Amino acid sequence: MKIFYIRHAPTMANINGDIVEDYDGQSIVFFDKDKWHEKVGSNLPKDFKLFISPAKRCKETAKALFPDKEYTVVQDLAEFDLSELNKSGHKFWEIDEETFNKYIFLPERSIINRWLNALGSMLCKCDSNDDTVVVIGHGFYGRLVNEIYENNDDSVFDILNSKNFSFGNLDMMEIDKRKVVNVWRY
């Protein structure tokens, strides 16, 4: 299975670095769809199955980028709840590892298991192992996939904070044969 993984379009919380209570209530903000299709989307094959996180911003991104395409929601692609970090009083990019670990318990193994469960769900919906899928999800999973395949040995905090790999809104990576083979930046 070849996977093209796209991070959802930006929200005001992304832009402002806000940690929000209601992750699924965030709507996307305007972005230039023509520019995205020219810089990023032109690298997609014509035929693919579309899978998305259940978050509102992922559904809105799917409808904006692929208005005529049906999609399947994959629960295991859901965002992780980091709202406890609100108690720190910081913007997301101001949080250090000690503060993160004080408020959040998020073992790397559980994150990897969710990604593997998501892959299993997607594979079950494909007609063959050779199908191409497009996934619209969260930046965290994009960075995690890079971590898994590049073996950087980063902590969960490092992955969240893009220590060795940045994956911005509307960026896309191609994953084939258990490695990241291309990354396109919006």
Per-range role (PLM):
Residues N16, E60-A64, E84, L144-Y149:
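A short acidic (Asp/Glu
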Residues V20-F31, L65-S121, N161:
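Phosphate-handling substructures
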Residues K2-V74, Y103, P107, G168:
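Active-site-proximal alpha-helix that buttresses catalytic centers in soluble enzyme cores
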Residues D153-Y186:
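Domain-level recognition of soluble alpha/beta enzyme cores
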Residues N43-K46, K125-T132:
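Glycine-rich phosphate-binding loop signature in dinucleotide/nucleotide-binding domains
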Residues A9-M12, A55-C58, A78-F80, G139-G142, ...:
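Short, solvent-exposed loop/turn segments at secondary-structure junctions
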Residues R7, V74-L77, D176, W184:
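Residues at the C-termini of beta-strands that transition into short coil/loop
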Residues K2-I6, F51, D130-Y141:
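Beta-strand elements within well-structured catalytic alpha/beta cores of enzymes
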